[in-house]
Curated annotation (Swiss-Prot):
Gene Ontology biological process: arginine catabolic process to ornithine; arginine deiminase pathway
Keyword match GTP-binding: no
Main location as per UniProt: cytoplasm
Protein's name according to its UniProt entry: Arginine deiminase
Active site per the UniProt annotation: 397
């Protein structure tokens, strides 16, 4: 039986990937709630969907199997045969703890599986449920929050709720409350969808963990090494716990490299500033290093008495040592001009999706970064991005690779 999950590198030929087509959750963003929903602007959904469809077709043209999160979730929910248990979990994690939770549950239970999944993703407005007698003071206030269930507009960034490492997966505790429920869909799919439930899929780290971990910070360097960013969204303690889990249960993993990056929104995950594009080539945002090209990296290995942690500053040399090559090439996002570099990094110039060794998908808007990649011998497929980029994520962010060929 073929493995349902297999990721042993960032660059092996991509075979199967999970995406989420932008939907009506994006139309529930309003200016007042932009910040809490983690957006800087309101996208135009119709164009966003066209751009996403173009992106998906680009992958399909490369013989990549593209699976949709919303479709798998509905199929898994039908297979589970217990909508109420799943719905209760969703509502409980939405902080609907008063009587309104009962109204929400009863309303959503009237939907079939596809409709329920769509509604849970899109969010549930208070105006959608028939008017009832108001019993509580908070319901009588003139200033009313418009949602019973918040929309999940970041769901099209399927990279973050989970990440495949080897034949197992991390189902992540998301840092921001606006994204916490996203990984419930992944949990549902892995547990109940026939594509995955018939196999014993190891869970390296679960969403009940006490510390946040997000897939944009998880990079599988090779069969023996994982890189994890310590960032705005991923806690150092989560990295340590993940390393302990991998060393105990994934015998092929020998090292975890923890890379410390600035805790800012523009650098929210490691893959916004660093991605692998070929066997010894990487894109990098120059601003995460000092003038000597250094940044903090910590090598975590299994020792006789627990974890052994070795601090280093020479990041490029560490990568070369792990890959067992004389040196690696760092291709600067936006080049050496600090203005161009900052602009293109903001628009995800470093967030490449490798679909094969030396072959990537990027946003078309980052012309300097794309030209530099081509000069370095990388085959670049550009996709349109005027609306997709408003969510602060690029091609890597919009995909959760499930299967890659081994190198």
């Amino acid at each position: 039986m073929e493995k349902a999950l297999n990721i042993t590198s960032e660059i092996g030929k991509l075979q199967t990937v999970l995406v989420k087509r932008p939907g009506s959750e994006l139309e529930n963003i309003t200016p007042e709630y932009l910040e809490s929903l983690l957006f800087d602007d309101i996208p135009y959904l119709k164009m966003m969907q066209k751009e996403h469809d173009f992106f998906v077709k680009r992958m399909q043209d490369s013989n990549i199997e593209v699976l949709y999160l919303e479709k798998l979730a509905a199929e898994a929910l039908r297979k589970a045969g217990n909508k109420e248990t799943f719905l209760t979990k969703m509502i409980n994690e939405s902080n609907q703890m008063d009587e309104s939770a009962l109204y929400v549950r009863d309303y959503l239970m009237s939907f079939n599986e596809e409709e329920m999944i769509r509604k849970l993703m899109a969010g549930l407005k208070k105006s959608e449920i028939p008017e009832r007698k108001k019993k509580h003071l908070n319901e009588m206030m003139s200033e009313q929050y418009p949602f019973f269930l918040d929309p999940l507009p970041n769901l099209y960034f399927t990279r973050d709720p989970a990440a495949v490492i080897g034949s197992g997966v991390t189902i992540n505790k998301m840092f921001q409350p606006a994204r916490r429920r996203e990984s419930i869909f992944i949990e549902l799919i892995l547990k109940h969808h026939p594509r995955f439930s018939n196999q014993e899929v190891p869970i390296w780290s679960g969403r009940e963990e006490p510390f946040s971990l997000e897939g944009g910070d998880e990079l599988v360097l090779n069969e023996e090494t994982v890189i994890v960013g310590v960032s705005e969204r991923t806690d150092a303690r989560a990295v340590e716990r993940l390393a302990e889990s991998l060393f105990a249960r994934a015998p092929k993993i020998k090292k975890v490299l923890a890379v410390e990056i600035p805790e800012t929104r523009s650098f929210m995950h490691l893959d916004t500033v660093f991605t692998m594009v070929s066997d010894a080539q990487f894109t990098i945002h120059p601003a995460i290093q000092n003038q000597q090209g250094e940044l903090n990296v910590y090598i975590l290995e299994k020792g006789k008495n627990g974890l052994e942690i070795t601090p280093r500053r020479d990041f490029r040399r560490v990568i070369a040592e792990v890959l067992e090559v004389p040196e690696v090439e760092f291709i600067p996002c936006g080049g050496e001009d600090v203005i161009v570099s900052a602009r293109e990094q903001w628009n995800d110039g470093a967030n490449t999706l490798a679909i094969a060794p030396g072959e990537v998908i990027t946003y078309d808007r980052n012309q300097v970064s794309n030209d530099l990649l081509r000069r370095a011998g990388i085959k670049v497929h550009e996709v349109i991005s005027s609306e997709l980029s408003r969510g602060r994520g690029g091609p890597r962010c919009m995909t959760m690779p499930l299967v890659r060929e081994n190198l």
